[in-house]
């Protein structure tokens, strides 16, 4: 106050002179001085007031009088004011309220008071649905401050409508700024004009402009659109509000609006950008509206709508900023915007929330790279050059991988997911308009099932676990569709009536076991099953499987895609394709429990999107999922070292003598002669948690004896298994191998002549525990990376229990033998007929005695039988060899071949050949295998009425045509997906001589 009094006295003499006659000549100086005093005084706490010379003199005299009254009078006056506002007024108000309450008690509530309040409430909340007024928020709804409140009290507004008049702590509010008309194009762009004035450096030369204001905080934008289309049209408009200062689409898209483009009433889109915009010539290009329509029936070249915009913003300087209201900060900024709904129109709005996460921080690199200006350096008196200036480099980097393995039974149900927007938008605060006609509430809604784990639950299975359980026991086996036919869960009906489900099937298995025992269980999923298929873990786990030890992991979760060819599935798809589920025991109880128990399996529809898993044979993927069960490594509790070895030539099947087990990944890998790759293994502990061990893993040749003393001289990986550790993974780079190795090895090959690498597992120290039992590890080869394949493999009879991998496409001309059929020497009427299912690898004859057939378990034959879905070109070659005892002059044999796509007589022939060449001939043709599941076809499936290809033979003079051999070759475009559980395949391949007699295999 003393500072103010001093300045007033300082200016008093000048003011007295200005009011004199001579002061009229300097009236403009008076106004300027008064403005300085006004700005200085109100900058203390108040907002500017309307001033003039007379107003100032009166104010000054009153102020001087107040000062002269003295401190005692001032305090007395303030006490009187305090008594009036604190005591007198509340007492009178309480008296009036008490009188009103007494009247209500005596007379009751007036009859029309509730009706009036209801009418007022309806008008307040529904007026925007019936009136075409602007809905841009008021200034006090967005910004607050003492300066604005005092200005409002004094009758002066702190709001301006021109950028040129914008000053510190001012609010810019401009309505009806015209925009360019919206053209009728497939996609159009309309800049959002924030000011009608041209903003540039020249604007700041005027006296009215406040040069301190450099930016605007854009609080609200209302886009008003009047459509020229018919009021009864069905055109839907989609609008994207874009911030052009961002190049990343996740940051650029601020809001999405969808609304009908019918004429009549305007479309009003409100957005709250909450963004600081620099005042510069291109500020009107900062925000742009991208528009498109659902159909293009409006005439091209014509304008579809006229548009204008209303803007509310606040000036921001280096010394002052805005203060948002709690309503704006907690409600409007969170909702981001909305569409005004007129006459129950269907409207929809969603807004981007692209906030950084912990993962973004950990995976970001902040690199500082500063190069100084070149420096002129003198070399000599006649020469100088520019040399490089000083430089500065520094980088801040987080971890490249940040993975948290945390079991979770309940998914986060707080987010709302909108189809088509999951990848870009966090729709936690998406706003659906109120009313009966919501954007997504249609009777023809075909969207997928998306809910919480409880809401998306489709089934529950109880599996009895007996107390006497050994490895290989099948606990449950059957179609997966049977599990999902239970009608007592929330999403069961939705599952039965939804055409396309894009989420994976989420499985949660729970089993309580004692900690002093161990158990290995597996739940396996395969695309099909044929005949008396084997349920061995080698065959069942190759497609999708969860293998775990319940003693270490009480709750096991797994998600899989039942349609490996596509990103969607349905219940009818599971039923008609025969998708199969097997629950099997991998390792029995290591300690016998007292009673039987049971396991509970819950089935849910996951929010995780389905991803296809397709194997490309001759142009394979960089990362190949294998799921090849290598076997169990058992380490007993003893004082001596135990050695376990597993071959890495993984192209053959698994099984006993004269029969093998085969699955799709191994059949694919066996197509190559040699291979080399990075190997990744998963180690699963299957014994009691109290039995621990330290195991060393390394790769070496298989002929190392068990008593080798320097095993750990090889480069090895030392794994320490703790009490509760269930599993871990190890990997070996292909750089550790000198060269590639064979995918298949003959079963009679000695280890010293093998020449292929083996995976070794040896005990680093002894296994000991107070609990009885062995330390058991289940080993699975998860996948291969950066695979190199060399050559094509024709196959080996009964190749050793090994496996193979493939990569890098090649043109191959190597044929695989499939069938060898010998005709009967004494055919009835000289005729013999048979048919071959080319895709199912099956043979049907007319049943005559003397006919002999042999099926070769070659790589292509195994691939066709184990692959559920096939796509590509199959090349077939038929070779006939006649009996040499028949002379050329006496040759009278004739063969007729017909190619049909079904064994039903109602199907027409696709191709037909007649061959009568004596003694020997061959015929080659190709078939394009294509189907309804994104080009993939399933053999003999009732789903989409899928069939097969049949090659029918009718041989006249069968005694002369002794042997028919069928060979296959796959085209470079061949693809396969999904595994079929098969019975054990015979590997015996006796040869026939040209007289039809069986010969010993060489």
From Swiss-Prot:
Coiled-coil annotated residue ranges, if any: none
Residues covered by region (Hydrophobic): 46-68
Keyword DNA-binding: yes
GO-annotated biological processes: symbiont-mediated suppression of host innate immune response; transport of virus in host, cell to cell
Single annotated GO MF: structural molecule activity
Region (Involved in tubule formation by the movement protein): 392-398
Site (Cleavage): 433-434, 806-807, 985-986
InterPro entries: Como_LCP, RNA2_polyprotein, Viral_coat
One Gene Ontology CC term in the entry: T=3 icosahedral viral capsid
Pfam family, one: Como_LCP
Gene3D superfamilies registered for this protein in UniProt: 2.60.120.20
Keyword tags: Capsid protein, DNA-binding, GTP-binding, Host cell junction, Host-virus interaction, Inhibition of host innate immune response by virus, Nucleotide-binding, RNA-binding, Suppressor of RNA silencing, T=3 icosahedral capsid protein, Transport, Viral immunoevasion, Viral movement protein, Virion
Protein name: RNA2 polyprotein
Species per Swiss-Prot/TrEMBL record: Cowpea severe mosaic virus (strain DG) (CPSMV)
């Amino acid at each position: 106050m003393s500072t103010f009094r001093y300045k007033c006295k300082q200016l008093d003499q000048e003011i007295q002179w200005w009011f004199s006659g001579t002061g009229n000549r300097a009236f403009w100086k008076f106004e300027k001085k008064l403005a300085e005093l006004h700005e200085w005084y109100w900058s203390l706490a108040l907002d500017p007031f309307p001033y003039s010379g007379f107003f100032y003199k009166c104010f000054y005299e009153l102020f001087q009088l107040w000062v002269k009254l003295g401190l005692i009078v001032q305090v007395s006056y303030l006490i009187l004011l305090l008594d009036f506002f604190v005591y007198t007024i509340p007492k009178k108000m309480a008296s009036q309220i008490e009188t009103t309450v007494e009247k209500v008690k005596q007379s009751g509530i007036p009859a029309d008071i509730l009706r009036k309040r209801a009418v007022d409430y309806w008008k307040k909340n529904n007026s925007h649905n019936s009136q075409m007024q602007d809905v841009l928020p008021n200034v006090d709804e967005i910004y607050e401050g003492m300066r604005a409140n005092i200005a409002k009290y004094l009758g002066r507004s702190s709001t301006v409508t021109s950028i040129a008049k914008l000053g510190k702590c001012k609010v810019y509010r401009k309505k009806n700024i015209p925009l360019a008309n919206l053209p009728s194009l497939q996609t159009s762009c309309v800049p959002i004009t924030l000011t009608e004035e041209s903003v540039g450096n020249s604007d700041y030369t005027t006296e009215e402009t406040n040069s301190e204001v450099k930016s605007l905080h854009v609080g609200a934008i209302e886009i008003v659109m009047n459509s020229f289309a018919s009021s009864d049209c069905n055109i839907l408009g989609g609008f994207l509000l874009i911030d052009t200062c961002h190049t990343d689409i996740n940051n650029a898209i601020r809001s999405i609006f969808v609304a009908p483009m019918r004429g009549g009433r305007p479309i009003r889109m409100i957005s709250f950008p909450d963004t600081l915009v620099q005042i510069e010539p291109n500020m009107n290009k900062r925000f742009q509206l991208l528009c498109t329509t659902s159909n293009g029936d409006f005439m091209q070249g014509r304008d579809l709508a006229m548009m204008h915009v209303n803007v509310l913003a606040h000036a921001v300087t280096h010394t002052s900023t805005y203060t948002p209201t709690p309503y704006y900060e907690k409600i409007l900024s969170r909702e981001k915007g909305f569409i005004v709904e007129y006459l129950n129109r269907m409207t929809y709005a969603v807004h981007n929330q692209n906030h950084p996460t912990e993962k973004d921080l950990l995976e970001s690199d902040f690199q500082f790279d500063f190069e100084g200006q070149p420096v002129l350096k003198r070399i000599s008196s006649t020469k100088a050059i520019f040399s490089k200036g000083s430089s500065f480099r520094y980088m801040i980097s987080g971890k490249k991988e940040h993975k948290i393995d945390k079991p979770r039974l309940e998914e986060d149900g707080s987010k709302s997911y909108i189809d088509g927007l999951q990848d870009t938008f966090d729709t936690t605060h998406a706003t659906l308009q109120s009313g009966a006609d919501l954007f997504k509430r249609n009777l023809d809604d075909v969207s997928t099932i998306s809910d919480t784990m409880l809401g998306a639950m489709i089934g529950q299975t109880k599996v009895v676990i007996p107390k006497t359980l050994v490895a290989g026991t099948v606990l449950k086996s059957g179609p997966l569709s049977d599990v999902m036919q239970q009608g007592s869960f929330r999403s069961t009906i939705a599952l039965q009536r939804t055409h396309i489900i894009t989420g994976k099937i989420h499985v949660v298995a729970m089993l309580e076991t004692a900690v002093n025992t161990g158990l290995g269980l597996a739940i396996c999923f395969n695309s099909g099953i044929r005949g008396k298929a084997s349920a061995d873990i080698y065959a069942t786990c190759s497609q999708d499987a969860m293998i775990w030890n319940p003693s270490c992991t009480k709750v096991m979760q797994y998600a899989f895609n039942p349609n490996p060819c596509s990103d969607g599935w349905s219940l009818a798809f599971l039923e008609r394709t025969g998708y199969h589920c097997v629950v099997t025991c991998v390792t029995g109880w290591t300690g016998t429990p007292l009673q039987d128990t049971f396991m509970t399996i819950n089935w849910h529809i996951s929010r995780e999107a389905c991803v296809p898993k397709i194997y490309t044979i001759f142009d394979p993927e960089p990362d190949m999922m294998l799921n090849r069960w290598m076997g169990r490594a058992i380490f007993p509790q003893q004082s001596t070292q135990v050695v376990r070895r597993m071959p890495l030539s993984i192209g053959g099947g698994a099984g006993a003598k004269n029969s093998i087990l085969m699955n799709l990944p191994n059949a694919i890998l066996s197509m190559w002669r040699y291979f080399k790759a990075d190997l990744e293994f998963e180690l699963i502990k299957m014994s009691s948690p109290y039995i621990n061990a330290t195991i060393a893993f390394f790769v070496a040749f298989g002929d190392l004896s068990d008593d080798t003393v320097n095993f750990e001289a090889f480069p090895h990986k030392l794994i320490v298994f703790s009490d509760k550790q269930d599993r871990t993974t190890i990997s070996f780079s292909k750089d550790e191998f000198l060269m590639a190795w064979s995918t298949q090895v003959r079963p009679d090959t000695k280890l010293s002549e093998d020449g292929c690498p083996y995976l070794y597992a040896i005990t680093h120290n002894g296994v000991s525990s107070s609990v009885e039992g062995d330390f058991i590890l289940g080993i699975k080869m998860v996948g291969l990376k950066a695979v190199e394949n060399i050559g094509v493999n024709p196959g080996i009879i009964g190749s050793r229990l090994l496996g193979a991998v493939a990569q890098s496409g090649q043109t191959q001309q190597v044929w695989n033998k499939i069938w060898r059929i010998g005709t009967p020497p004494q055919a009835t009427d000289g005729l013999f007929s048979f048919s071959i299912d080319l895709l199912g690898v099956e043979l049907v004859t007319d049943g005559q005695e003397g006919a002999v057939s042999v099926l070769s378990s070659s790589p292509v034959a195994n691939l066709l039988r184990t692959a559920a879905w096939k796509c590509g070109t199959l090349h077939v070659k038929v070779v006939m060899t006649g009996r040499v005892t028949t002379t050329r002059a006496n040759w009278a044999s004739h063969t007729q071949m017909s190619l049909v796509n079904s064994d039903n007589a109602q199907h027409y022939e696709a191709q037909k050949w007649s061959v009568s060449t004596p003694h020997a001939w061959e015929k080659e043709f190709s078939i394009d295998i294509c189907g309804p599941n994104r080009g993939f076809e399933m053999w003999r499936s009732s789903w989409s009425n899928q069939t097969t290809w049949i090659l029918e033979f009718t041989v006249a003079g069968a005694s002369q045509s002794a042997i028919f051999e069928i060979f296959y070759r796959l085209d470079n475009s061949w693809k396969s997906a999904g595994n079929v559980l098969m019975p054990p395949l015979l590997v015996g391949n006796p040869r026939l001589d040209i007289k039809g007699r069986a010969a010993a295999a060489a």
